[in-house]
Design a protein with these regions (language model features):
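N-terminal maturation segment of proteins
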Residues: 1-313
Length: 313
């Protein structure tokens, strides 16, 4: 029932929002904000670009190498490590995601593996941003960084999926703004489009599993709000939410918490905002509930201008 779903939301997201109602309002506001920005920015030329764009690097090894270099601009250095890219066995393609990172043993974080799914089902999934999510500066990067700075083994046993998936989603979205062959206008549009798409899934997760939407209500919402008229698509989305309640919240709510902190820091610090310092704060804290992370962030927000002033002097 509702109480169990509330428990799932708390456990899977560690969100700083006090209730599911407040969280739903925040998710809705963010989707509306990104959708409105897209509507204002979209032109006929940009729409055509969206249909046929290509990143400057398209091969997995070249993409990872490029991401590794670009990550150094706004993210702290990693200790020496390697990454092997492997193909998902054909027999497993239909049951696995477009790509995934295998978490290494805590005492052997230097050796990393990313699997890429070659299924035609994922042919339209951009490999560049996918590898940013799984590799640099996503799961691989965050795992290696935390393993290199964490001296408390028990923390490796604790699971805070909204931090890890939220971080990977945040940097996936940030990778749209890397030097990747796309125009700034297209980068912004693509990033917002991904955010809206993920947000819709998170909103459906909440409305179906907490507020009790039926398949008919789900189909009506998707048609009226986003113009999705295919009933098979809406039914498939409904079933996915029922099968894995709170799953999409790990990604979207995790990203939303981090993005909100970044935007607050940018607004508060102005020209003193340093992405490197912000990212280092989150990485040093490591996986934790956002109720805990927000408290540390607020303290950092007060001291950051003083620290950066000392560095500048």
């Amino acid at each position: 029932g509702k109480e169990y779903y509330e428990y799932l939301v708390r456990m899977s997201t560690g969100t700083s929002y006090a209730s599911v109602d407040e969280l739903t309002d925040a998710v809705t506001r963010r989707i509306d904000e990104d959708a409105a920005a897209m509507a204002n920015e979209l032109t006929a030329e940009l729409y055509l670009e969206m249909l046929s764009y290509s990143f400057s690097e398209t091969e997995p090894d070249a993409i990872l190498a490029d991401l590794k270099v670009q990550t150094k601009q706004e993210f702290p250095e990693l200790p020496e490590c390697s990454c092997t890219i492997k193909a998902v066995p054909e027999a497993l393609e239909l049951s696995l995601s477009p790509a995934f990172y295998l978490t290494p043993p805590m005492d052997r974080f230097q050796d990393n593996v990313i699997y890429i799914n070659g299924s035609e089902e994922y042919a339209d999934t951009p490999l560049y941003t996918t590898l940013a999510h799984e590799g640099y500066p996503g799961h691989l990067y965050q795992t290696v960084y935390f393993s290199s700075v964490c001296d408390d083994p028990i923390r490796h046993l604790l699971s805070f999926p909204a931090y890890t998936e939220g971080w990977a989603t945040y940097v996936e979205f940030q990778s749209y703004f890397f030097d990747n062959g796309l125009s700034p206008e297209l980068q912004n549009l693509l990033m917002r489009n991904q955010a809206v798409t993920l947000g819709i899934h998170a909103l459906l997760d909440l409305n179906i599993n907490y507020y009790g939407w039926t398949k008919d209500q789900t189909a009506a919402f998707l048609e009226e709000t986003y113009g999705i008229t295919d009933r098979e698509t809406s039914d498939r989305m409904f079933d996915a939410m029922v099968d894995n309640p709170a799953n999409y919240l790990e990604y979207y709510v995790g990203w939303l918490e981090i993005q909100q902190m970044r935007e607050q820091a940018e607004e508060t610090l102005g020209s003193s905002f340093d992405p490197m310092e912000f990212h280092t704060l989150l990485l040093d804290l490591g996986p934790a509930p956002f109720t805990v992370i927000r408290a540390h962030f607020q303290s950092w927000l007060v001291t950051a201008p003083l620290t950066q002033g000392d560095l500048a002097a």
